[in-house]
Amino acid sequence: MLQIKSIPAFDDNYIWLIQNRDRDCAVVDPGSAEPVLAYLKQHDLNLKAVLITHHHHDHIGGVAELVHQFPEIHVVGPAQEPIPTLTHPVEDGDQIELFDERFMVLGLPGHTLGHIGYVGDGKLFCGDVLFSAGCGRVFEGTMEQMFSSLNKLLSLPEETQVYSAHEYTAANVAFALAVEPENEQLHIYRDEVSRLRAQNQPTLPTTLGREKWVNPFLRTQEPSVIRSVASQVSTLDPLTIFTALREWKNEF
């Protein structure tokens, strides 16, 4: 079983560090090298690999410096995105070996066209596609692509731990409660999130099982979610409901 640690960066990013028992590690989406280097030094760890989900600067900004400091590391990332430091470009359906665990690469377009995720050892590293109680903005792809990517994640086991790249949970829960004000699970979760953030603790990882109860973007067939946007749409199919929710969240 791999250990996962969070390294905060910028205002709300998480760089996830994956560690084995031999003090070897990998990091996911290092937008800045400085906090990673400090953590490696403090905990006497050996960096072996970098995993990248997409090309946005707050996810890759530290990669060049990490490669400079550790020239032998593997840099794994989406083959379809402009990331010059990649040594191992991957795409949907590929597999990678990481510290004797096998991770599957999932194509998750929507936020960006080539966005990918990594799932293995009961853990999902999904970048800016799925957040707790929310989902990423659709920048390069289409609403249909993002909706399809989220549905792909729903097929994973409910106990899968979800490691998103940002601490957006409190704001997402506020929106989710606007969508479903009578969702008792959301009220319970809001209190838990408030307690964790008051202690400066991360709200992640979450689980897919929990997200099915609290994330409106995964609940587009629930009557309470449909009612929240029904007056804004002409049809009530799940993609239309998702699109209306995402557009609402953009302005929330």
Swiss-Prot record:
Stated EC number for the protein is 3.1.2.6
Annotated Zn(2+) 1 binding lies at: H54, H56, H111, D128
The record lists the organism as: Vibrio cholerae serotype O1 (strain ATCC 39315 / El Tor Inaba N16961)
For this protein, what is any one GO molecular function term?
A: metal ion binding
The record describes its quaternary structure and partners as: Monomer.
Q: Which NCBIfam families match?
A: GSH_gloB
Keyword entries, A-Z: Hydrolase, Metal-binding, Zinc
Give the matching InterPro entries: Clx_II_MBL, Glyoxalase_II_hydrolase, HAGH_C, Hydroxyacylglutathione_Hdrlase, Metallo-B-lactamas, RibonucZ/Hydroxyglut_hydro
| Keyword Metal-binding recorded | yes
Q: Which Gene3D superfamilies match?
A: Ribonuclease Z/Hydroxyacylglutathione hydrolase-like (3.60.15.10)
Q: What pathway does the UniProt record associate with this protein?
A: Secondary metabolite metabolism; methylglyoxal degradation; (R)-lactate from methylglyoxal: step 2/2
Instruction: Quote the protein name from its UniProt record.
Output: Hydroxyacylglutathione hydrolase
What reaction is this protein's catalytic activity?
Answer: an S-(2-hydroxyacyl)glutathione + H2O = a 2-hydroxy carboxylate + glutathione + H(+)
The free-text cofactor remark is: Binds 2 Zn(2+) ions per subunit.
Role noted for this protein = Thiolesterase that catalyzes the hydrolysis of S-D-lactoyl-glutathione to form glutathione and D-lactic acid.
Q: Which residues bind Zn(2+) 2?
A: D58, H59, D128, H166
Q: Which family does it belong to?
A: Belongs to the metallo-beta-lactamase superfamily. Glyoxalase II family.
Q: Some GO term, biological process aspect, for this entry: which one?
A: methylglyoxal catabolic process to D-lactate via S-lactoyl-glutathione
